[in-house]
């Protein structure tokens, strides 16, 4: 996906992309210790092509059980 395509993702498309990504990790025996929302963050963040806060805000605005402070704390060690 291009950065522009990522910016235009809907919530439904993000969930589908997340599910494809997790399936690929499992098929390739890749274990990642990130929460669901952290994995979604990595998809939206797109290696820094998109804003850190934009990605976090988008996820937490779409998912009511997303805790912004907890997500930021989880990501702090990586960014």
Predicted regions and their residues:
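Acidic, low-complexity, intrinsically disordered interaction modules
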Residues: 22-79
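N-terminal acidic leader/helix
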Residues: 2-35
């Amino acid at each position: 996906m291009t950065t522009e395509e990522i910016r235009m993702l809907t919530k439904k498309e993000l969930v589908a992309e997340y599910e494809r990504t997790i399936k690929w990790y499992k098929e390739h025996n890749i274990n990642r210790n990130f929460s669901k929302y952290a994995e979604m963050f990595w998809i939206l963040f797109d290696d820094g092509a998109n804003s850190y806060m934009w990605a976090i805000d988008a996820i937490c605005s779409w998912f009511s059980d997303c805790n912004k402070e907890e997500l930021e704390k989880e990501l702090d060690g990586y960014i």
